[in-house]
Amino acid sequence: MDMTVLTSYFNMESLDSLKVTMGGGIGSHLLNVALGLVMFGIALGIKPANFVNIIKNPKSIITGIVCQIILLPALTFLLIIACGNLLSPMVALGMILVAACPGGNVSNFITSLSRGNSELSVSLTAFNTAVCIFTTPINFALWGRLYLNYAGNHNIGSLPQLEIPFWEIFQSIVIIMGIPLVLGMLCAHYYPKIAEKLNKPLQRLSIVVFVAMVVIIFASNFKAFLDCIAYIFIVVLVHNLLALGIGFGSSSALRLPYKDRRTLTIETGIQNSGLGLILLMNPNIFPKEVAGEATVWASNGGMVVITAWWGVWHIISGFTLAYLWRKRGRREPIED
């Protein structure tokens, strides 16, 4: 089938033209508060010992860091190049944004359910969340610009001028994630009993928060969403399988303990798409208009929808893996 027929079938233009809102300024602020609470909940389970584990157990942790910060964005870029005209520029940039975000907030919970290495999972979450202040804007800027250069040379869609306001992204992530992270760790240190009681309920709440965010985003664009559901589903499915494969393939190639393989698979396959949504809704980062005139970011529906659907699908795939691993009950391979 010709590429033009496929892209027409999946209706990418209507996807990019979706006008997505979160109920105005109030909705956007509520989104920020929701993610802040989620990050506070994650921090309740983080202890200084988790950072010490990076030194004590370097092989598994360094593998996880490389998978998430280096391999996932790089291989996402190669996947986008391989897809060519099947992806619109905004959809491609949405995939890059998701890959640039740190690990998802439910990864620790799913790792525990799948009988993975919970200590490794928490250590990776702690490290990747702490450094995402720098890695998220750097990865998005680097791979986003490389993609736009490639797309411009190959006449792929209507291309935006990608300007990455590093300071605005840095500031947003510090406020939304950095401050709650520090407060949560302080609470866990000084009030351990309270932190222990709040930890799991807040983890479960995070799932509800992400589902609610996606429902709000899709509710006002339901018909347009139905028109492109097949396209969205396939793109996110393939991208998520790539992420899961990076984690499992890398850890298997290095012959890590099987519990660690499960953990790295989940950590790489579950991304904090909620952070991506908040960045997309920030008019200082992605302005819809300048001086009364619409910008290219006024048509970033493809980015928003791909990022939002990731927030649903990675939970489905994560719990599916956890169920299969628990049911299979596979033992760790005997180490040399």
Outline where the language-model segments fall.
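Alpha-helical transmembrane segments of multi-pass small-molecule/ion transporters
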Residues: 1-336
